[in-house]
């Protein structure tokens, strides 16, 4: 069986008046995240993990922030495109594990909704999707409530 592991990491700074989107879910908070696209840091980390697993670079290569075509882009669309590239190479998801690193907002009320969005976008069982959150105990930029970081690890298997 041919399997691949991909790791993704992304960070965005709080700011602006756009809604806070995390994992395709609108999370109530006083501000959104600054980004060229819609700023969904969760989906960006996952997209990088998918692309990394199949040796296709990163989202910056596929959707450069210098290209106005991607200004305000829907990150769910970007993720589905990345996953299609993996499927075109014969791979499907085995499982996904995501860690959201944020002091604010509290993520627990939103974890299940994020898992459900990801399950639909990957067309896989909910049991294959794990999302968790942690803080840095008020240390660093996330602890100072300046932004959010996300790590994602995905296992892809040859279909």
UniProtKB/Swiss-Prot annotation:
Pathway connected to this protein: Isoprenoid biosynthesis; isopentenyl diphosphate biosynthesis via DXP pathway; isopentenyl diphosphate from 1-deoxy-D-xylulose 5-phosphate: step 4/6
Cross-referenced Gene3D superfamilies: 2-C-methyl-D-erythritol 2,4-cyclodiphosphate synthase (3.30.1330.50)
A Pfam family annotated for this UniProt entry: YgbB
Residues at the site labelled Transition state stabilizer: 36, 135
Uppermost EC category: lyase
Cofactor remark from the record: Binds 1 divalent metal cation per subunit.
Catalytic reaction(s) noted: 4-CDP-2-C-methyl-D-erythritol 2-phosphate = 2-C-methyl-D-erythritol 2,4-cyclic diphosphate + CMP
Gene Ontology annotations of biological process type: isopentenyl diphosphate biosynthetic process, methylerythritol 4-phosphate pathway; terpenoid biosynthetic process
Keywords in alphabetical order: Isoprene biosynthesis, Lyase, Metal-binding
Alphabetized CDD domains for the sequence: MECDP_synthase
Entry annotated with the keyword Magnesium: no
SUPFAM superfamilies xrefs: IpsF-like (SSF69765)
Known EC number: 4.6.1.12
Residues the entry annotates as binding a divalent metal cation: 10, 12, 44
Binding site for 4-CDP-2-C-methyl-D-erythritol 2-phosphate: 10-12, 36-37, 58-60, 63-67, 102-108, 134-137, 141, 144
Protein family according to the UniProt entry: Belongs to the IspF family.
Subunit-level organization: Homotrimer.
Function (record text): Involved in the biosynthesis of isopentenyl diphosphate (IPP) and dimethylallyl diphosphate (DMAPP), two major building blocks of isoprenoid compounds. Catalyzes the conversion of 4-diphosphocytidyl-2-C-methyl-D-erythritol 2-phosphate (CDP-ME2P) to 2-C-methyl-D-erythritol 2,4-cyclodiphosphate (ME-CPP) with a corresponding release of cytidine 5-monophosphate (CMP).
Matches recorded under PANTHER family: 2-C-METHYL-D-ERYTHRITOL 2,4-CYCLODIPHOSPHATE SYNTHASE, CHLOROPLASTIC
Name of the protein described by the UniProt record: 2-C-methyl-D-erythritol 2,4-cyclodiphosphate synthase
Species, as recorded: Shewanella woodyi (strain ATCC 51908 / MS32)
Lineage of the species this protein comes from: Bacteria, Pseudomonadati, Pseudomonadota, Gammaproteobacteria, Alteromonadales
Name of the gene this protein is made from: ispF
């Amino acid at each position: 069986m041919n399997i691949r592991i991909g790791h993704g990491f992304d960070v965005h700074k709080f700011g602006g008046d756009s809604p806070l989107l995390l994992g395709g879910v609108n999370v109530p908070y006083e501000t959104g995240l600054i980004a060229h696209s819609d700023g969904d840091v969760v989906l960006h980390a996952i997209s990088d993990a998918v692309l990394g697993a199949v040796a296709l670079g990163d989202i910056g290569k596929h959707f450069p922030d210098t290209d106005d075509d991607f200004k305000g882009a829907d990150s769910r669309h970007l993720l589905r495109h990345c996953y299609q590239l993996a499927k075109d190479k014969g791979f499907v998801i085995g499982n996904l594990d995501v860690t959201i690193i944020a002091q604010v907002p509290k993520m627990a009320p939103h974890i299940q909704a994020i898992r459900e969005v990801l399950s639909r976008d990957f067309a896989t069982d909910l049991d294959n999707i794990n999302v968790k959150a942690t803080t840095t105990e008020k240390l660093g930029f996330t602890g100072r409530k300046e932004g959010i970081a996300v790590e994602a690890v995905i296992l892809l298997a040859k279909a």
